[in-house]
Amino acid sequence: MSRFLNNKLRRYGMRAMLSLVLSALGIAAGSSNEVAADASVKASIETSKGVIELNLYSDKAPLTVANFVNLVERGYYNGLVFHRVIPDFMIQGGCPDGRGTGGPGYTFADEFDSSLKHDAPGILSMANAGPRTNGSQFFITHVPTPWLDGKHTVFGRVTKGQSVVDAIKGNDKINKITLSGDTAGV
């Protein structure tokens, strides 16, 4: 695992443990189908079909958001394509070889929060090949996909541009991804 992710894991490890303990004691807020994203970090995906705006859940999936922010800041996603598009399911991008088999050269663990579900269109989640295989690939849903809960880390939600998500076809381009908000705190 990269030094960047190790530092983030150490930084958020205590927070995650505290959250787990509070949840076990029933002190944390109850779950809801409408989870408010931490609006302090936002992403904007400029595609060949238009712009998709997202809020990221840096408070509930800190390692995943930190990884995504790091890759965006390095320009990793710029020029890649949505290599896997399944109508009435999802669009997937983030593979450097455009075939769904590549990644950034490392993997990291899943982050599951019981309040984050694949319960609506526009859920931003990590694509993976099984437990602990997250890297750079992500997907955005067209419809609710509850069978993915507990298998793929949810780390954001579309706030504007779901029609763009729905218009994306295979090999449509990610021109660039930009961030706004407090990315220094991620």
Question: What does each of the following model-derived ranges do?
Answer:
Residues 2-11, 15-186:
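Cyclophilin-like peptidyl-prolyl cis-trans isomerases
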